[in-house]
Every structure is written in structure tokens, then in C-alpha cells.
Amino acid sequence: MRVKTGVVRRRRHKKVLKLARGFYSGRRKHFRKAKEQLERSMYYAFRDRKQKKRDFRSLWVVRINAACRMHNTSYSRFMHALKVANIELDRKVLADMAMNDMQAFTSVLESVKEHL
């Protein structure tokens, strides 16, 4: 018995075209182009979710380093002193302190001064 793909194909096409909303021109309207663009888009999304973590970590390092240099020390010395002093503040929190609460950051820096 012959099986037609009418319903299955329509569902698949609808699913792809629904996900392709917001794309430009034929990449939104034509199934094949939409499917190709969607594949690429999903690849970019997957890759950049990993990249985002690296980008934010490097941003935090830059911010902490800038705050440390205002107090005549370097990022690497400061992080080593934190480890030696057994203070477990992560880079995200330290960068936030450096940006929004310099007084708190300075107090942390003063508390590890003896380990520098």
C-alpha cells in the first residue's frame, strides 16, 4: 500500500516556517531556504551560548583588574591573595562590587592586603 507524505510534510514545513519567523525575505517564506537558515541559526545559538560564558568571565576579569589597578595592585596578585586568605568570592560578585560598590571592594582589598 502506498503511503503519501501530505500531512507529515505539511506539519514539518509548518514547524520550520514557524521557527523561521523574523528571518528576511525568502529565508522566511521558502521552506528550503528557511530550513538551511534555521540549521545555521541553531548552530550559532548553540555555539554562542558557550561563547557567552567566556565573554562574561573576561569582562569580569577586566573590571576587577581595573579596580585593582586603582589601588596599585594587579588582578593576578589580588586573586592569589584571595585564595591564600581563604575568601571565596567569585569573579561575578567581585566585578559587581568593583562597578557598583567601590567601598565594599576596597574593604575586601584591605582585608587581603597582608597576603599580597
From Swiss-Prot:
Record's family? Belongs to the bacterial ribosomal protein bL20 family.
Q: Please give the SUPFAM superfamilies that the UniProt record associates with this protein.
A: Ribosomal protein L20
Q: Which UniProt keywords apply?
A: Ribonucleoprotein, Ribosomal protein, RNA-binding, rRNA-binding
Annotated GO molecular function terms are: rRNA binding; structural constituent of ribosome
Its gene name is rplT
Give the superkingdom in one word: Bacteria
Q: Give all cystine bridges in this chain.
A: none
Which NCBIfam families does this chain map to?
rplT_bact (TIGR01032)
Q: Which Pfam families match?
A: Ribosomal_L20
Q: What does this protein do?
A: Binds directly to 23S ribosomal RNA and is necessary for the in vitro assembly process of the 50S ribosomal subunit. It is not involved in the protein synthesizing functions of that subunit.
In the UniProt record, which is one GO cellular component term? ribonucleoprotein complex
Q: What is this protein called?
A: Large ribosomal subunit protein bL20
GO biological process terms, semicolon-separated: ribosomal large subunit assembly; translation
